[in-house]
Swiss-Prot record:
It is an enzyme of class 7 (translocase). It is found in: Mitochondrion inner membrane. Core subunit of respiratory chain NADH dehydrogenase (Complex I) which is composed of 45 different subunits. Its EC number is 7.1.1.2. InterPro entries: ComplexI_Subunit6 (IPR050269), NADH_UbQ/plastoQ_OxRdtase_su6 (IPR001457), Nuo/plastoQ_OxRdtase_6_NuoJ (IPR042106). This is NADH-ubiquinone oxidoreductase chain 6.
Length: 175
């Protein structure tokens, strides 16, 4: 069952990535990136990286939502162009979806895809977990290192996101 959840999240991830460059309006490009980021975080959570998935979701998607929210509020169009309003953009989007669908069908029919890795069927996409031999897990040690030794990194990252939002607001407003 979990293999199918990851498979569906992978399809949503690719659809979001196809929808991002074929954007007719900047609002939909940001939406494609946010959908892809959420699906990627879901895949990381499914493979056992609960803290990593949560941190990526909060920091990356939180920062993107703030930036895209402010920029679309400052430079919004009254009637934004959608994917179906331009036949070339719609055709490119549908062509990308069709190519992804054909690649998935080829892999599901026990075909072999050999680019960098060799996939022969859907079972090869599953990551097999190994049991930890230590007392502490890797994620707990990473959290401890982030908040003890890397506290200034967290502060600088938060401040950089704030300054980025202020700069983008000033640039889009023309001030």
């Amino acid at each position: 069952m979990m293999t199918y959840v990851v498979f569906i999240l992978s399809i949503v991830f690719v659809i979001g990535l196809i929808g991002s460059p074929s954007k007719p309006s900047p609002i939909y490009g940001g939406l494609g990136l946010i959908v892809s980021g959420g699906a990627g975080c879901g895949m990381v959570l499914n493979f056992g990286g609960s803290f990593l998935g949560l941190m990526v979701f909060l920091v990356y998607l939180g920062g993107m939502l703030v930036v895209f929210g402010y920029t679309t509020a400052m430079a919004t169009e009254q009637y934004p162009e959608v994917w179906v309003s331009n036949k070339v953009v719609l055709g490119a989007f549908l062509l990308g979806l069709m190519m992804e669908f054909l690649a998935v069908l080829y892999v599901l029919k026990e075909g072999e895809v050999e680019l960098v890795f060799k996939f022969s069927g859907l079972g090869d996409w599953v990551v097999y977990g190994m049991s930890d031999f230590g007392v502490f897990s890797g994620e707990a040690m990473g959290v401890a290192a982030l908040y003890s030794y890397g506290v200034w990194l967290v502060v600088v990252t938060g401040w950089s996101l704030f300054v980025g939002v202020v700069v983008i607001m000033e640039v889009t407003r023309g001030g």
